[in-house]
Structure formats: structure tokens, C-alpha cells
């Protein structure tokens, strides 16, 4: 499946919630009609079946983290193999992606932008260049901006925006050094309450 390259706000409108695909700290309600789905008949949101609700939740989370369908299914399979709650395991695996950690630290204003920084070799993990967005970040790994990329306007701007966002408690950020230490894997209570991961588990369990 190809990566979606169309208008980002359209995806948020389709899911009826902010997927944080656009930069900035303004509420998404000020940018678009979030309660209406895109298209001519967007104002009419039909009642979904149980399967439809589960599918929408999966699509919402997949798009939020910018993961393709096959990748997402593989993450679910890995989450199911791990001990503990499958849904929580899934979210933790997604949170450990390097592109997501770069976004959480504040080097990028969106996960899509973070993915570009990683792919363009602007990011170091423990002092080594890593250009794989799906790279799994472990506890105590230090993620930083490569020296020659530190003056990039988009990174400087993203760090300024990040100061206005709630900082993740599981990452220690040093904005001056442009580095962040992934202290621990986030717990479920650290993450968005708007995600119902159990619906995804129910979908894939069929």
C-alpha cells in the first residue's frame, strides 16, 4: 500500500479526531470542520457496525503514527507474542519507533517531518547515524541531531513549537544540545486516552 500524500487535515476529518499530522499548537477545530467527514456528504456520519468502529480505530492509530498497513499488522503480531496486554504492547512498539521519538523530543513538528529527518540522515542514535524510521529505540538510548543539521530552520522552529506542547515524561530533553534520552518505554497512562487499542485487538482477533 502506498503512503498517503494528500491533504493531511482530510485524514483527521475522516477519523473525527486530531491525528497530529499538521504542525503547530492551534486546535484542529480552528483549521477545519473536524466533526464533518470530508466530501459532499461529510456532515452525515452514518452509524457504524462493530466491525466498522474497530476498523476506524485501527485506521486512526495507523495514520496517527504514519505506518503502512503491512507494517501495522506486523506490529500487532509482535505485540501479541509479547507478555502482557496486547493493545498496550502495540502502542509501546509504535512509540519506540525512531521517527516517533524524534517527534516526541521536538526535533520535528509532525511525525511525517520526523520520518524525513531520519531518512535524510539528520538523526543520530548513541552517536551513530540511523536512517531507518522504524528503528526500535531502547531505554537509555540517546537520540540527537547530527552536527551539520543543527542549523536547519525546520528543526529550530520545531523545537520552539515543542516548548508549547506537553513534554513526554519518559524522554529527557536537552534542547540546547539538541538531544533526548529515551529513559523508559511509556506506560499506557502516559499516552493518549483518545485511543481505544482494545478495538484494534478485537479487529485482528477475528
Swiss-Prot record:
Function: One of the primary rRNA binding proteins, it binds directly to 16S rRNA where it nucleates assembly of the body of the 30S subunit. With S5 and S12 plays an important role in translational accuracy.
Taxon lineage: Bacteria, Pseudomonadati, Pseudomonadota, Gammaproteobacteria, Alteromonadales
Quaternary structure (record): Part of the 30S ribosomal subunit. Contacts protein S5. The interaction surface between S4 and S5 is involved in control of translational fidelity.
Gene from which this protein is expressed: rpsD
Annotated source species: Pseudoalteromonas atlantica (strain T6c / ATCC BAA-1087)
Pfam families per UniProt: Ribosomal_S4, S4
Annotated Gene Ontology cellular component terms: small ribosomal subunit
Family: Belongs to the universal ribosomal protein uS4 family.
Keyword Transmembrane: no
Sequence ranges assigned to domain S4 RNA-binding in this UniProt record: 96-156
Gene Ontology molecular function, alphabetical: rRNA binding; structural constituent of ribosome
Protein known as: Small ribosomal subunit protein uS4
Example of a GO biological process term: ribosomal small subunit biogenesis
Entry annotated with the keyword RNA-binding: yes
Superkingdom, natural source: Bacteria
Amino acid at each position: 500500500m502506498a503512503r498517503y500524500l494528500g491533504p493531511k487535515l482530510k485524514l483527521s476529518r475522516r477519523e473525527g479526531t486530531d491525528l497530529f499530522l499538521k504542525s503547530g499548537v492551534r486546535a484542529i477545530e480552528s483549521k477545519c470542520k473536524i466533526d464533518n467527514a470530508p466530501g459532499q456528504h461529510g456532515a452525515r456520519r452514518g452509524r457504524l457496525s462493530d466491525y466498522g468502529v474497530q476498523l476506524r480505530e485501527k485506521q486512526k492509530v495507523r495514520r496517527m503514527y504514519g505506518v503502512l498497513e503491512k507494517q501495522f499488522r506486523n506490529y500487532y503480531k509482535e505485540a501479541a507474542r509479547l507478555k502482557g496486554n496486547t493493545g498496550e504492547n502495540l502502542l509501546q512498539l509504535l512509540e519506540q519507533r525512531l521517527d516517533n521519538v524524534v517527534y516526541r523530543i521536538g526535533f520535528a513538528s509532525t511525525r511525517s517531518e520526523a520520518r524525513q529527518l531520519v531518512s535524510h540522515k539528520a538523526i543520530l542514535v548513541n552517536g551513530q547515524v540511523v536512517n531507518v524510521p522504524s528503528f526500535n529505540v531502547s531505554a537509555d538510548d540517546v537520540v540527537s541531531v547530527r552536527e551539520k543539521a543543527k542549523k536547519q530552520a525546520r528543526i529550530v522552529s520545531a523545537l520552539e513549537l515543542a516548548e508549547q506542547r506537553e513534554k513526554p515524561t519518559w524522554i529527557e530533553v536537552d534542547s540546547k544540545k539538541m538531544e533526548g534520552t529515551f529513559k523508559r518505554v511509556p506506560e499506557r497512562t502516559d499516552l493518549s486516552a483518545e485511543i481505544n487499542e482494545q478495538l484494534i485487538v478485537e479487529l485482528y482477533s477475528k
